[in-house]
């Protein structure tokens, strides 16, 4: 057994996997840029006080927490929204609104590793701060959808609104703790636990709330669900207001979706519209989640600022994609024999190709031609330029197609056409 192994819950990425990841990252960045979101990054670690500000001390067991040499308690970021909120307060509070930011970076959670769940993982997401208009929510939803369409992923999006159930809780005078307990059970899809909790609350408060909660949770479908639920909740003013807000948002979402009020989101800072996107592979893993969080900036002592955002679970996305486009092929340049003259010619050829944006590898081992060609095969390189003394004096090189075995002479002046 090797002495050193990678830490539990982390991964090494081989070159082929990194090519795939970079290709998908590039396509997603293209969509974020097309919406004129600006890329930022934040420190890998933040103060534990910041990371626990909303959820409290109980989040400690989910984080990598340590003390620095100044005895200050720090934690590796488990996600980016809190960091972006802090960054916004520090750097962007006087910037014209809305502020539109995106990021792609690694995050850390101390949890049991399993398929699609790691202790180090990557997120790509956006935050739109400063607008409470429905069109802002719609822009974020559309961005999330169009990113996944750009990479040809098969997915399903569920959209809901926390205000619908919150209005029911308010009508029955539930405390914040009781409402949060129900939300967490819904988020975990623990229906038995939910029934038990609702039964206990009904007994303690002498109310009948279970039927109304399950009525909300069970009604799913297209936009017509909103009008149906408005009829059922006509006595719940706050719930009706939330439904009308969701309807205004969906007016600007020209994509297929499922309305689902069973989306509770695990993070406590969401306040309105929420959505989740699932890959359609077996297991239907969530690959994206987001929503509106209008109180988070204020929680971190900034000026009240409405905000909406989402994050892709980049590793989950990679598990949902098979069909990767091949990036431009690399070219292998090899001299027929090792001589300073031929090596210098190879360097000139490589520079010309690299300056044109092509990926070029030189033979750095002084191999004989047959071994150099075997190396190219092993690396999956399809094009090899063979530089010989007589050919180069005539301004030519040999181009070998490693797939077909065909070889032909080409003029150096035409080198960029290969």
Curated annotation (Swiss-Prot):
Localization, per the record, is: Cytoplasm
Matching CDD domains: HisRS-like_core
Tell me a GO cellular component.
cytoplasm
Any keyword ATP-binding?
Answer: yes
Known EC number = 6.1.1.21
Record's InterPro entries? Answer: aa-tRNA-synth_II (IPR006195), aa-tRNA-synth_II/BPL/LPL (IPR045864), Anticodon-bd (IPR004154), Anticodon-bd_dom_sf (IPR036621), His-tRNA-ligase (IPR015807), HisRS-like_core (IPR041715), HisRS/HisZ (IPR004516), HisZ (IPR004517)
Going by the UniProt record, its keywords in alphabetical order are: Aminoacyl-tRNA synthetase, ATP-binding, Cytoplasm, Ligase, Nucleotide-binding, Protein biosynthesis
Secretion signal, residue range per the UniProt entry: none
Check the record and name the PANTHER family matching this protein: HISTIDINE--TRNA LIGASE, MITOCHONDRIAL-RELATED, HISTIDYL-TRNA SYNTHETASE
What is the protein name given in its UniProt record? Answer: Histidine--tRNA ligase
Q: What is the lineage of its organism?
A: Archaea, Methanobacteriati, Methanobacteriota, Methanomada group, Methanococci
Protein's gene: hisS
């Amino acid at each position: 057994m090797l002495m050193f192994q990678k830490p539990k819950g982390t991964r090494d990425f081989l070159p082929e996997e990194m090519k795939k990841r970079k290709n998908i990252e590039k396509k997603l960045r293209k969509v974020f840029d097309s919406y004129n979101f600006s890329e930022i990054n934040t420190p890998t670690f933040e103060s534990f006080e910041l990371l626990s500000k909303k959820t409290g001390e109980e989040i400690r067991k989910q984080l990598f927490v340590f003390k620095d040499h100044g005895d200050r308690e720090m934690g590796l970021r488990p996600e980016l929204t809190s960091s972006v909120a802090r960054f916004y307060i520090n750097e962007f509070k006087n910037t014209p609104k809305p502020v539109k930011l995106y990021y792609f970076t690694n995050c850390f959670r101390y949890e049991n590793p399993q398929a699609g769940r790691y202790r180090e993982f990557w997120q790509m997401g956006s935050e739109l701060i400063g607008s409470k208009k429905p069109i802002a929510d719609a822009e974020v939803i559309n961005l999330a959808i169009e990113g996944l369409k750009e990479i040809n992923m098969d997915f399903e999006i569920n959209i809901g609104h926390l205000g619908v159930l919150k209005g029911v809780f308010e009508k029955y005078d539930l405390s914040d703790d009781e409402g949060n307990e129900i939300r967490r059970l819904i988020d975990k899809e623990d229906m038995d636990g939910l029934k038990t909790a609702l039964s206990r609350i009904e007994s303690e408060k002498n109310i009948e709330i279970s039927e109304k909660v399950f009525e909300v949770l069970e009604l799913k479908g297209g936009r017509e669900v909103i009008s149906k639920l408005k009829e059922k909740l006509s006595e719940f003013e706050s719930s009706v207001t939330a439904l009308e807000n969701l309807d205004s948002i969906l007016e600007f979402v020209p994509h297929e979706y499922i309305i689902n009020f069973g989306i509770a989101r695990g993070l406590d800072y969401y306040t309105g519209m929420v959505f989740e996107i699932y890959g359609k592979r077996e297991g239907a893993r969530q690959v994206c989640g987001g929503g509106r969080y209008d109180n988070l900036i204020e929680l971190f002592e900034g000026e009240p600022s409405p905000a909406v955002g989402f994050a892709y679970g980049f590793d989950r996305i990679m598990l949902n994609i098979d069909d990767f486009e091949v990036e431009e092929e690399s070219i292998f340049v090899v001299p027929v024999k090792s001589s300073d003259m031929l090596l210098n010619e190879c360097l000139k050829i490589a520079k010309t190709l690299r300056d044109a944006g092509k990926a070029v590898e030189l033979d750095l081992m002084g191999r004989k031609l047959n071994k150099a060609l075997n190396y190219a095969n092993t690396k999956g390189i399809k094009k090899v330029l063979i530089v010989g003394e007589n050919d180069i004096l005539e301004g030519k090189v040999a181009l070998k197609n490693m797939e077909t075995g065909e070889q032909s002479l080409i003029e150096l002046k035409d080198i960029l056409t290969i």
